[in-house]
Amino acid sequence: ARALGARYIQPNGPTHRHWIVFDVDHAAATLSWDDVGAPAPNITVTNKANGHAHLIYGLDTPIRTAPDGNAAPLRYAAAIEAALREKLGADMGYSGLICKNPLHEHWLVQVWEPRLYDLAWLSDYLDLSSYNGRKSLPEYGLGRN
């Protein structure tokens, strides 16, 4: 209950990724997804003072990130996360562990896509050809598992 009143929250637990969060640090971050032809985030949470935003994508089926999880879906999700981060021009150093709380009044919150995504739907917007075993995944986000 305390987390609901916090300005920042941890959107995912230790064993599953329900939300993929990107940190976009420029004044037009809220609509940056549209400018580059990326899928609409489910939610944007924007800093009213500078326009920087967290773009949040919800997954209809969470990705298991625990050590006993299946490597193939995890690698696929990591490739999607890396390609989408690149397309959005999002902060490469942001791990997604903590994000702006969409329920906190400090932020400007907008809902763009009410339906949760599956990985195939997200991949429709991305070129994943460089991640088909030839390109190393980043050592952060889903790629570090």
Describe each PLM feature range.
Residues 105-145:
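Long, charge-rich alpha-helical interaction segments
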Residues 45, 54-56, 93-99:
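A structural signal for short, well-ordered beta-strand segments and their strand-loop junctions
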Residues 1-53, 59-75:
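Signature for HUH/AEP ssDNA processing cores
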Residues 38-44, 81-94:
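Structural alpha-beta junctions
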Residues 68-88:
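Short secondary-structure subsegments characteristic of cysteine-rich extracellular domains
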Residues 2-4, 32, 91-94, 118:
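Poly-acidic low-complexity segments
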Residues 89-109:
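Short, surface-exposed recognition loops or helix-turn segments adjacent to catalytic cores
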